[in-house]
Amino acid sequence: MSLKRGDFALVYYPHSDLRTVKLRPVLVVQAEELNTGLPQLIVAMVTSNLARAGHPSRVTVLMKDPLAPETGLKTDSVIMTDNLGTIELQLVRRAIGRISRMEAVDQALRNTLGL
């Protein structure tokens, strides 16, 4: 499976205890030209917990937004660029959609990483 920056996917993502996993949506945030030779992706976790919205490192996706259907997300969600992970490709279950405008995500990443 070939995923690109801006793609949403369902992946087996570890719980905070690092012992169990849950199928969760993520957003691929790594540069497309990043070719490390390793079968992995850098992703931002996505949550449906809207209490996590409103921070400069997070981007809210509301289903009423005209671009929301292309994301493949099923409910209002928050992209958390302050919760990044590197996952192995074998943990990817499937792609579900994409975000066509990455400007807000890019700004959130700059806020998170101090760039």
What are these regions (language model features)?
Residues M1-L115:
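Conserved functional hotspots at enzyme active or ligand-binding sites that engage polyanionic ligands
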